[in-house]
Amino acid sequence: MDGEAQNESVACEKATLAPVDRLRSNRAESPTPGLVEGTEPGAVQKSAFFAHAQSFEDLTAEAEEKAEQEGVVEDSGQTEDELQVLVGERTITEQHAQDVSPQSRSKEEDMSSEAWRSHRKHVFVLSEAGKPIYTRYGSEEALSSTMGVMMALVSFVESDKNTIRSIHADGCKVIFLAKSPLVLVGVSQTYQSDKELLRELQYIYYQIVSLLTLTQLNHIFQNKQNYDLRRLLAGSEYLTDNLLHRLDRDPGLLLSAVTCLPLSNSVRDVVSSSLQAAKAKNLVFSILLAGDRLVTLVRKKDQFLHHIDLHLVMNLVGSSSSFREGEGWTPICLPKFNTAGFFHAHISYLESASDLCLILVSTDREDFFNMSDCKQRFLERLTKRTAYQALKEALKCPSYSVEQVGIPELRHFLYKSKSSGLYTSPEFPELYQSDEEQERLMGLYQDLHSHLHHPVRPLRFFYRCTNKENLLAWVTNGFQLYLCFSPLGTKAMAVSAVNKLLKWIRKEEDRLFILSPLTY
């Protein structure tokens, strides 16, 4: 029942984080200032590296913001044939052939089958002419008539100078997102709000734009309204499939944030300064990942990366194993930075058997060898220092257990610092080891998130009881916090646990967050 609402391994489980080498002298011991943005645990001490760090609303805005950095990235100027070569090169087509598992796409499902109907969430993408572009389950050809009906609904409402946003019927939501020249439709039987589902459709839209650029997309449909966009996107469906999977499982996409590899502050500083020293004229962003966790990010001064763009980059890297085979070079549009042109990303792993992946983002399509040289200079500098071995040791235990917090009733939590756009959470405990249980817990977090960000009646605090767990959500100007407790706990105990948790995060913030990001 609902309560009150107000306006890697076993070895890791008992491990502790590395001893504090040095805490920031100007950081308050008490987490109380976290009620104000910029003073919360995990707040950056210098300018943040994410633009719009709090922008959940940014995902559901009516119109796109005009990029302040417009002109930094050149318009690619590719013809349609050239673009097809870009989208179809090795980083897309061959990766698709070797990386997509039978479980990742259910293209053989018939829409009249029970299996197809049993999916709790469907996503469809079509053109304004009603041409099918993508479906999560089943084949686009078999669903072409269904998508035609969807487009007819959109057109009928628009003919009356109105916009269809959603349809609610019999426990099912149908959400529409019109982003000319595309229309995206989500059909859901989950407890997610319209706004949550709209956020997911926005991510899918940005994923498509990242492959083509909005300029090219508009150009194609201006010349031929009934163009079949699947010709250009062939082989890239696995990226959208994987992104949808991440939307169901990754708290970062829910929180509009990124999580960091827990790492001693002194080690992270050495890694960051080594990356900063390996700069080049056209280099805009240097990103070092450890799986789905951020080790460090160095950016060009006055150029900011949006967390959505970083999520798209992480999705590209995480969707393919072929980047481990050598140095990759791929065009990618970062739609929250500039929808008009491509960046070019040098993607490689520091070691073939390591999870450390380096992404160097350049504005020059001919910059492969310069970026390769940057990587070598970074490696040469880093391998001369003991920090590299410490970094590799940290990979053996890339998370931490909730037991380290010292709150017996606490099972799991999500904490986001609003000013930094970073979040932290422990590994899932034994009770939530199965995929089904993790998705169920994420569904509960999504429900809490929906209440806190309700478009009409947003809440600051929400406490919910279920048969399996009790949950608490709290949002302030400085942070968002979601906690999962044993069902035997009480609301008073949960509120008391918040202060203990914030103190623990404050004590460990040097290794859980990047407090002082560097620039070139």
UniProtKB/Swiss-Prot annotation:
Disulfide bonds: none
Residue numbers spanned by region Disordered: 1-43, 55-79, 93-114
Biased composition (Acidic residues): 70-79
An example Gene Ontology CC term for this record: Mon1-Ccz1 complex
Biological process annotations from GO: protein targeting to vacuole; vesicle-mediated transport
Similarity remark: Belongs to the MON1/SAND family.
PANTHER family named in the record: SAND PROTEIN-RELATED, VACUOLAR FUSION PROTEIN MON1 HOMOLOG A
Official protein name in the record: Protein SAND
